[in-house]
Amino acid sequence: MQATKPAITGAQIRAARAFLHWSVQDLAERCGVSESAISRAEKMDGVPSMQGRNLNAVRTAFEIHGIEFLDSTGLRIRPR
């Protein structure tokens, strides 16, 4: 059984996007979530009130590009 990953926060979404030098549009294209939904999520304190599948799509887009989320505190590049 796979462990559930903790939800990511708006601050982590902003930080991961900045780390990868992605615009909101870049992230939206990579994860299939609207730019407006991403912008709203980034402005929220804590876990965004975004549909679970959208939040998972955002997380997956970052993880594919090497981002590893650390609980609700930060992120890093996944070691190879």
Model-assigned labels for residue ranges:
Residues I13-D26:
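Short basic helix-loop element that most often maps to the first helix and adjoining turn
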Residues I67-R80:
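Helix-turn-helix/homeodomain-like alpha-helical modules used for DNA recognition
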Residues A18, G32, K43:
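Residue-level detection of the helix-turn-helix DNA-binding "recognition helix"
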Residues M1-I8:
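A detector for short, charged/polar N-terminal pre-domain segments
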